[in-house]
Each structure stands twice: as structure tokens, then as C-alpha cells.
Amino acid sequence: MSQQRGVNGLRFNQDQSCFCCAMETGVRIFNIEPLMEKGHLDQEQVGSVGQVEMLHRCNLLALVGGGSNPKFSDISVLIWDDSRDGKDKLVLEFTFTKPVLSVRLRSDKIVIALKNRIYVYSFPDNPTKLFEFDTRDNPKGLCDLCPSLEKQLLIFPGHKCGSLQLVDLCNAKPGSSSAPFTINAHQSELGCLAINQQGTLVASASRKGTLIRLFDTQTREQLVELRRGTDPATLYCINFSHDSSFLCSSSDKGTVHIFALKDTKLNRRSALARVGKVGPMIGQYVDSQWSLASFTVPAESACICAFGKNTSKNVNSVIAVCVDGTFHKYVFTPEGNCNREAFDVYLDICDDDIF
């Protein structure tokens, strides 16, 4: 994610009610509805930060050093407990021999991704290494972790090009080399991954970025193929709505796409779908479902997207947070109408400002 206005990285928390910014000047945390700053760590405390991950809305943060003036190394994950008194609020440290590329948290585990390895530790009390998985080259540290208490599913790239691995951390035995289930999702390298909050669905896109495929975690079968576009694109983010009725994605094309999952008839189809029998290559294109709705953000600014709180049964909202400091909220209807409801510059909001 390209850096602008001092923002090195952006992440939503597990229920998408907050987002956090890893910055050249430290860390800032924002509540989404209403939009307001929830807290911050300044540069004197933590230096410049490359990555930050929240644990729900609690006092624990996972930090990885980065940027131009880091206080901490990029081979370490530091756990910051903001509830502790005094200046020393670093309570845990996980150090490796290679750079940490991503961190995921749930209430009882922490997952840390390196270029060719995924580590899983118990968390936060007396952390113990539970699992270690080898992966093919994973330069973006792709992985996702289900936050559900019922399902402890972890997904990450498999050994085969375009494959993803699915591990049930509940059933696997700590310390064992439990073989993950493999889903052959794409023909080219994976570019983006997401798992829904219930742990029942996985979405993936390749680095080509034209298609998003949806899989059932129980049967590991493909359920639907969603078409973002025809031109290659780098996907920054895929997210499910809270009840998994919808999915959104953002890319370097500057468009946030919204797809229907529960009622896929709401998605648009290619006009060629009405033509009749076509060749196999065109057939694949015709069979794809196009987004129900979409909106644009500055194309030169990387962004993450997520679903907001439902305002009514027939109106849903999507939030886009960009590294240029802008915040966008759009509402959409099942008919595909999409309108901007809010815009702000979150980096200009202070502690006492409320949106």
C-alpha cells in the first residue's frame, strides 16, 4: 500500500467498527460511526510504524516498525497495552530472523506472516507457539483469521501457484504438522484473501485482479465467480458484510465494487449472457457476475473498504478509507443505486472533533 500523507498502512478491526493507521508519526485509531479519533500513539512513544493491528475495541495493539524513522525493527511484533500505567506499555515481543509482513489477531491467538512462513501463537497470556506453516513466496504476507468463537479458521497461500490453504485451528493439534485443506482457487499467484466473520466463506483474487472467487469453507467448493473488471488491477482489500449478504473490494483502479452474495440475482450480468451459446473463453466471461453497485475514490490513493451499519432493511453502506487521509461513506440499495452520504479528511480530525 503506497504511502501518502505519512500513512504507511491501514487496517480495520475485526468487526469493522474502527480503523487504525500506521504512520510516520506513530499510530492513530478512529471510530467509524460516528467518525472520531479514538486514540493515538505519538512518534516519541513508538517511532514511525509500518503496520498496526487492533484487537476488537480493546487496549491491545500489535505494532511492527517501519517507515523512515522506526523505533522498532521490522522483524519484531510488539504488543502495546494502552491500559498500563506509566510509559512502559510494551508487554510482549515476538522476534524473527526475517521481516514481518502481516499480523492478525483474535481474542485467543496471534498469527504472524513472513515471506515463506506463518506462525500461530496463543495470545495474550503466556504466548506459546502452537503452529508453524511453510508457504510459497508470500511477499504481501497474505493471510486472514476468522474472529468467530465457534470457528477458528486460518487461510493463507498454499504451496501450489494460485492455491490457498485452510486450517481449522480448533481441530489441529498444537505442535503437529497438521495438513491444511487446499483450495485450487486461481491459475496465477494470489493477490488478496478474506474470510467472513462466521468462518463459512472465503474470497480470493489473483494478482491479475479481474476475478474474485467465493468458496464454501466446509465443502471447499466454489460458489460463485465475481468479475471486478476486464483490465488487470491490484486489489487492496476484500471484505464481507456482517451477515455475509454482500462483499466489497477496492483496487488501484480507484473503484470500490459491491457484490450481492445472498441474492446473486441482484448482480449485473454481461449482455452476452442473453446471446446464447458462445465459445469456452467467452463463456467464462459471460458466466461471471458483475458488481451490483460501485463508486470511485482517488485512483492514485490506495484504500481499504468495509461495510457500515445498516440504516434500514433496504439500505446498506460501505466505508472507504484512503491513505491520502480521506474517508468516504456510500449508501446503496438492492436495486444498485449508490450515493455518497459522507466525506471527510480523517487525518484532520482531532480528539475532540466528532463527525
Curated annotation (Swiss-Prot):
Positions annotated as WD repeat: 2-40, 185-225, 230-269
Localization of this protein: Preautophagosomal structure
Extent of motif L/FRRG motif: 226-229
Family (UniProt): Belongs to the WD repeat PROPPIN family.
Main location: other
Gene for this chain: wdr45
Signal peptide coordinates: none
GO BP, one annotated term: autophagosome assembly
Name of the protein in its database record: WD repeat domain phosphoinositide-interacting protein 4
Domain notes: The L/FRRG motif is required for recruitment to PtdIns3P.
CC annotations in GO: cytosol; phagophore assembly site; phagophore assembly site membrane
A Gene Ontology molecular function term of the record: protein-macromolecule adaptor activity
Function, in words: Component of the autophagy machinery that controls the major intracellular degradation process by which cytoplasmic materials are packaged into autophagosomes and delivered to lysosomes for degradation. Binds phosphatidylinositol 3-phosphate (PtdIns3P).
Domain of life (superkingdom): Eukaryota
InterPro entries linked: PROPPIN, WD40/YVTN_repeat-like_dom_sf, WD40_repeat_dom_sf, WD40_rpt
Keywords: Autophagy, Lipid-binding, Repeat, WD repeat
